[in-house]
Amino acid sequence: MEPDKDAWGTSRHSRLFPGPWLVHADLHNHTTLSDGKGDPADAFASMRAAGLDVAAITDHSRWASVAAGLVAMPGNSGIDRYGWEAAGRIADAADEPGAFVAMRGFEWSSALYGHANVWRSARFTDPLRSGLVAMAPFWRWLERHGEDGLAGFNHAGSAMLRFGRFRHRPAVAERVVSFEIFNKTNEHLLLGTERGRPSALVQCLDAGWRVGLLGVTDEHGSDWGHPEGKGRAGLYVHELSRAGVYEALAARRFFASRVKGLRLDAALDGVRMGGTVPVRGGPARFAVDLDRAGWTGRRLGVQVLRSGPGLPTLAAAVEVRVPGPDEPPVAFEADLGGAGGWVVLRVTDPEAAADPPATGQWAGLGRALAYASPFWLVPDGR
């Protein structure tokens, strides 16, 4: 099924690229299988009723393996073998290809290094078995026992050691697909910079990780999918199935949002977000497809972010107006100031207050609404 409009009345079709179409997803949720408050049997129905097309249960894995599967462990210890199997049964029962995708995953939850989601894997692990005092054991698990999994960095702005300062691991880099830029109601672009730490996004991308940008609710309550203002994601899929979702994640063909029913797509010199762009010199041309029911004519800001010392460099900031269906998509040019590296587009509401700890020019840009996945710049080989 490929419906023309989503639950909020927004067209699912990008005006920039044919083919894949938009589905709304929340890929990070908790239940009583770990430290959530809601029955896992109710989670997928709640998210489907809330208008989501794709949902995942990703309960914490912590230290339940200490029991070696001999007895069931309490939820605050994270999932054990019994919880992992139960999550799989619940997801399989809720999954309806073509109508709604239900997925099982887990959140590897280290108090020191941070939290990472893993989807698609047949197995799970926890920090007690893979990473109590280092990141390397988790990466090795993902290489060997979790070789079928896709992974992502969760709420990295608040992580203590930030995955070992995001030290790059080439063997798993293609399967580490995401970075949560919105988690719950928090934006993780500047979180931690008020304490002198670098932007987690800059730190991650500069380390060489080619991740797309996700929004997630990280829901721990029992109203999955319903609260306003929490993160969510838009994926462009070829089919509404688990395979279609995994393909879109692997292609980094997705965006982060904290607004329900938003469509965002972006191109840099004709290359879609998440792609590699040859740099030919001169101004770069951006095209942005923005739409939401009732937003025609609304004033928004679009910022072009590049690497910088600690904080992102603001390469450009433009004011745009959401076009109507008979008007061309937003387009503008910007000087990227050098070849190589990465580019991220950020969409803001200039009339709403920026999230703490934004100060200076960042405070003046307003509240972040969405992010496109990064573009990766490479020298033109012609």
Q: Across the structure, where does each feature detected by a protein language model lie?
A:
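Extended, charged catalytic domains and RNA/DNA-binding interfaces, predominantly
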Residues: 1-382
